[in-house]
Amino acid sequence: AVGSTASIVNMLIGLFAGLSTGAGVVISQAYGAKAEKRLSEAVQTTITLTFILSAVATIIGILIVDPMLRLMDTPEDVLPEAKAYLTIYFAGSTGLLFYNMGSGILRAVGDSRRPLYFLCFAAIVNVVFDLLFVVGFRMGVEGAAYATIISELLSALLVMYVLTKTDAPYAIKWKSLSLHFSAVKQIFSIGFPSSIQQALTSFSNVFVQSYINFFQTDCMAGYSSYNKLDAFILIPVQSLALASSTFVGQNYGAGQLKRGRDGVKKTLYMSIIVTAALTVLTMIFSGPLLSLFNDDPGVIEYGKKFVLIISPFYVTICFNQVFAGALRGIGRSTAPMIIMLSSFVAFRQLFLYCNKVFFGHSFIGTALAYPMGWVVCSILMIICYKRSALGKASDDAAGAVVK
């Protein structure tokens, strides 16, 4: 039941992660330019927006639970539990939003360690409370939901504590929280396209899930188990893409465009090496890894099929994620949005439809929808990056900034 909710949860995360990215770019540019007043205004605006958006997310999230689950063709036998999980999750989504925004601020000023430590702490707390609520108190999916929102709230409190206690210009000043129009405009101009892209991509995954739901229950469970491995493999490249955005933003603010380009190259190389290594390990040990989430032989067999079909394409994600992050770092977020929506939404849905019409809803065709979207997106993103000011930055123009 929890596995069937992933697309809806990711839609919420994607929507606000985009705004977090926008805030991070604005803050990193101000930090790189050593503009302390602009930096402080951006931080106070970010936290104020988080209060407003968390209330909106809670209300809208609870209202869309039932329609979204039915849109996914969620089987009736798991519908009540999935609905219970999502209702609790959205009701407690404030912690997630504050952690995302707060950690985005820290990463924007070069502090990526503490958000990672807090995230690891939250993961451990989540496991402990999962065991306590689900195994100990036998609360089922409701217990899993409570464990998740408690762990997210604790991570948010830790991030807020760090940002409150610092003496740096990016400190949160609770008595001075307000919306500065210039900061709001910048955050939304950069973050809104990213939010739309991530939310609509997750929304399209609702339909992908409906294609998965066409197959038997073992396939659904196998896909859910595979998704957990997928999330693990993608953590490094997504983190490096965020680092790319921050690094480029700081150097863009400081007028060092060529240095930003060099950083993007190194980030891309690192992401390819790490992703390739994780891909090989996952393919070799797919059986034991999948059994950690579900030990049913039928479920494991389907999970291994997803790993075998999709995993060889993971390296292609490095190109679209790193280059998209770099483009956002210089304030160009509309182009990545258009490219990703075209690839991850339009092309993917067309691919699935053709698979259904011409190949009778084949399993392999359904599984290939994701990697084919990655390939198309990477090709388009490489072209866009090469044509950008960042991609064209020359060794003779180390300090040039092209608006």
Regions found by a protein language model. Give the residues of each.
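Membrane-helix interface segments
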Residues: S112-R114, V141, D218-C219, S333-T334, ...
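Helix-terminus/linker motif at the lipid-water interface of multi-pass membrane proteins
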Residues: A1, L69-E76, L132-M139, A199-F232, ...
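Short alpha-helical transmembrane segments in multi-pass integral membrane proteins
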Residues: I27-T94, G136-F192, V248-F313, K356-K403
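Small-residue-rich hydrophobic transmembrane alpha-helices
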Residues: V2-I59, L96-P115, Q209, Y223-S286, ...
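Transmembrane helical elements of multi-pass membrane transporters/channels
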Residues: I88, Y99, A122, S151-S155, ...
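Hydrophobic/aromatic residues in alpha-helical transmembrane segments
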Residues: A23-G24, I64-V65, G102, F129-D130, ...
